[in-house]
């Protein structure tokens, strides 16, 4: 991950990174498909009630580009035992200024009710986010959060996800409820459309729409999204591309 301020050469590099997955997406729409079981994951910010398969791991990585910054994310996670998914990852943010910042995220997600076809799933998540600015003008910030994802299966690989949570902000000592509502609708057995809206109370809601595609069923997935703040013009919009890798069970 680069720590440097974006220059025209780097911007062209990111533009190509954003265009290539779109080309891949179109190509894969032309190939044969077969039935798959869907589950919520990247690129949704609204979490689902599922966890990684027992003794398995995943890596979610993505790039998020706004008008003034580029974020690079990588979040690995594993299910060692007890239907608990442990994740520890980070983000690096490059502004169109001399400043950059880093972020460390860790969480544990427990599945309490396994999702079945035409059924409900319930989980809880407890985690933290540490922001590490490189600027001397900003101190390290730590947020702690709790979230309760609830998933409703509607059949035919259609899902609705509801999140209810709480966030404690270290910077100003404030605590706020958080919420999210998202959905998944299959376009084909490999391709799924997603949409969501989410926020912390007293802050503007954000929305996101996108596509998720299985390149290799249950092992390799790519995605792309567009998002914005409700009621905002184009100055706060973003686009993202992502890659998700899943392993078979291999942990002892």
Language-model segments: residues:
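N-terminal secretory signal peptides that target proteins for export/translocation
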Residues: 1-19
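Residue-level detector of bioactive/disordered segments in secreted/extracellular proteins
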Residues: 13-14, 24, 80
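Hydrophobic alpha-helical transmembrane segments of integral membrane proteins
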Residues: 18, 31-32
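Sec-dependent N-terminal signal peptides
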Residues: 20-28
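Transmembrane beta-barrel domains of Gram-negative outer membranes and organellar outer membranes
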Residues: 39-252
């Amino acid at each position: 991950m680069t720590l440097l301020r974006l220059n025209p050469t780097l911007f062209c590099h990111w533009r190509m990174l954003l265009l290539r997955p779109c080309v891949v997406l179109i190509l894969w729409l032309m190939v044969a498909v077969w039935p798959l079981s869907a589950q919520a994951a990247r690129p949704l910010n609204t979490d689902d009630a599922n966890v990684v398969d027992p003794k398995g791991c995943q890596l979610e990585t993505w790039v998020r580009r706004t008008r003034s910054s580029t974020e690079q994310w990588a979040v690995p996670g594993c299910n060692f035992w007890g239907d608990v998914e442990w994740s520890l990852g980070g983000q690096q943010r490059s502004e169109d200024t001399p400043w950059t910042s880093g972020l460390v995220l860790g969480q544990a997600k427990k599945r309490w009710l396994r999702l079945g076809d035409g059924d409900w799933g319930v989980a809880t998540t407890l985690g933290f986010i540490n922001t590490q600015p490189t600027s001397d003008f900003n101190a390290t910030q730590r947020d702690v959060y709790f979230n309760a994802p609830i998933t409703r299966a509607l059949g035919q690989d259609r899902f609705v996800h509801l999140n209810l949570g709480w966030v404690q902000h270290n910077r100003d000592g404030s605590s706020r409820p958080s919420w999210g509502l998202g959905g998944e609708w299959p376009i084909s057995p490999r391709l799924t459309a997603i949409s969501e809206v989410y926020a912390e109370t007293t802050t503007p809601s954000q929305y996101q729409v996108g596509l998720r595609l299985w390149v290799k069923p249950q092992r390799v997935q790519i995605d792309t999204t567009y998002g914005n703040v409700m009621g905002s013009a184009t100055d706060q919009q973003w686009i993202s591309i992502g890659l998700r890798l899943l392993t078979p069970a291999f942990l002892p």
